[in-house]
A protein has these predicted regions:
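Catalytic domains that recognize anionic headgroups
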Residues: 1-467
């Protein structure tokens, strides 16, 4: 029988972040991936199907997770990418102050943004292009074995295998593992999640599984036919090579590599658009088949910001499935509550433990914003920052500087966000603006950062394919 209350004063904490994992690809019905280990965590825990990331880019999202603060209070909300404000007390620091040993295994991009500064292991990051199947999975398992006696511990694992370009291992390439390459890779990642949780004492460990953001999957069913615009094996291999080379190219040659990547990307987009010509596609179908999370537009559709959130293990009741909207900023306040730490003051998130335990709590609106831009933008990128607010029922987006409300969606009747109702719903716009204004009341002026740091950050993001 599952233990609901730990007799150990300080349980271990395992945070698994699967980069780019969409909520509807691991929680709910009609899943084509094989995920017995994620299913095990859900069965033995609480699963939230409507968790919202503040932005569809890793550093901004992770800063909100680690601080419980919206991006405009972490120093990450600006016209350019920035490092996490070093004056902010993260939950990792708080855990260390309460006797926790802190460890991380995360892609090197997290270090560039100051997200792994508070972890004690010197090998807290790995090269962004390294896969679980390149030895990283074994390294994580070995790490779990080595820290077993260093209780209590907090271990942050950030899995990058689902981040484009996706290269599916041969053992998971069969159709039974998923309809798309993306879904096959979810099956592959689930295997390693199983290996990880085998090495964890769930009676004395709180396991949290989530994602930083989602992604578009360019595969649709049309007239009983499957149209698949995911990168072919050859394209994926070329993308992977370019990605890996990106970390070896000298800084002075990065602009040339960037131009080559732009040419290849633009050529692929035009090719995809040509393939779509003549097809009767819905706005949603056209969006997922042609657009990309890495570049262009506000990138605030649910495909990109709705992520899974699962709490499992010590002090968590079993088989709780919760559809109420929650947010990234709620994750650590919940962890704090589960392990009975004093509450961190002046945060934007709140504990979900009462909701997990069956109590009704008020649903909080989620703040969302478009990612910062890189200086080498192409003409189709939105120049003015878009900010917004989301509830379970509606989503509103507005231009931050001009204040113009540009999009409004009824998420109940239009979950694919195909019909912009902003012009026909003035009262609703007013109500949503009021919610956003209340959230923004604590807006903080972003601190100035060293230009060398900013330039380095932008070079690293360009290597990953952001533009």
């Amino acid at each position: 029988m599952k233990k609901l209350f730990s007799t150990v004063s300080k349980p271990n904490i395992l945070l698994i972040v699967v980069d780019s994992l969409k909520s509807d690809k691991c929680i709910g019905k009609n899943l084509s991936s094989i995920t017995p280990n994620i299913d095990f965590l859900i069965k033995n825990g609480a699963a939230f199907s409507q968790a919202i990331s503040p932005a569809a880019v890793s550093p901004v999202a992770m800063s909100s997770i680690f601080t419980g603060l919206f991006p405009f209070r972490t120093g990450m909300s600006a016209d350019r990418f920035r490092k996490l404000d070093s004056d902010i007390t993260t939950y990792v620091k708080i855990l260390k102050n309460h006797g926790y040993n802190t460890f991380a295994t995360a892609p090197s991009i997290t270090k560039d943004f100051g997200l792994t500064n508070d972890f004690q292991n010197s090998d807290s990051t790995y090269e962004n292009s390294v896969s679980l199947f390149d030895g990283l999975g074994n390294k994580i398992v070995q790490m779990l074995s080595s820290i077993r006696t260093q209780t209590p511990w907090f271990f942050y694992i950030h899995i990058f295998d689902l981040h484009a370009p996706i290269t599916v291992p041969k053992n998971f390439s069969a159709e039974k593992f998923g309809k798309s390459k993306y879904e096959k890779m979810v099956s592959a990642i689930d295997y390693w999640i199983g290996e990880i949780i085998k090495n964890v004492d769930l009676e004395n460990t709180l396991v949290v599984l989530t994602a930083d953001h989602g992604d578009y999957i360019p595969v649709i069913e049309l007239d009983n036919e499957t149209i698949d615009l995911e990168a072919s094996d050859g394209q994926a291999k070329m993308d992977y090579i370019m990605w890996k080379l990106g970390h070896k190219v000298p800084a002075k040659l990065q602009p040339l590599k960037g131009k080559i990547r732009h040419i290849l990307r633009d050529s692929r987009i035009k090719s995809n658009e040509k393939k779509m010509n003549g097809l009767k596609l819905s706005p949603y179908q056209k969006r997922v088949m042609v657009e990309t999370r890495m570049v262009g537009g506000h990138r605030l559709y649910d495909d990109l910001i709705k992520v899974p959130l699962i709490f499992s293990g010590v002090n968590i009741p079993s088989n709780k499935k919760i559809t109420q909207q929650v947010r990234h900023v709620d994750i650590f306040p919940t962890i704090e509550d589960v392990i009975s730490l004093p509450k961190k003051n002046d945060i934007d998130g709140e504990s979900l433990l009462p909701l997990i335990n069956g109590k009704k709590i008020h649903e909080n609106p989620a703040y969302i914003e478009s990612p910062p831009e890189l200086p080498l933008d192409v003409s189709d990128i939105v120049k003015e920052k878009i900010i917004g607010v989301r509830t379970s029922s509606y989503k509103m987006l507005k231009q931050e500087n001009s204040g113009n409300v540009v999009e409004l969606y009824d998420l109940v009747s239009d979950p694919l966000e195909e019909e912009n109702i902003v012009s026909s719903s003035p009262e609703l716009v007013k109500d949503m603006e009021s919610k956003l204004e209340e959230i923004m009341a604590n807006k903080k002026i972003t601190t100035t950062q060293n230009k060398v740091d900013l330039d380095k950050i932008e070079r690293e993001l360009e290597k990953l394919g952001y533009n």
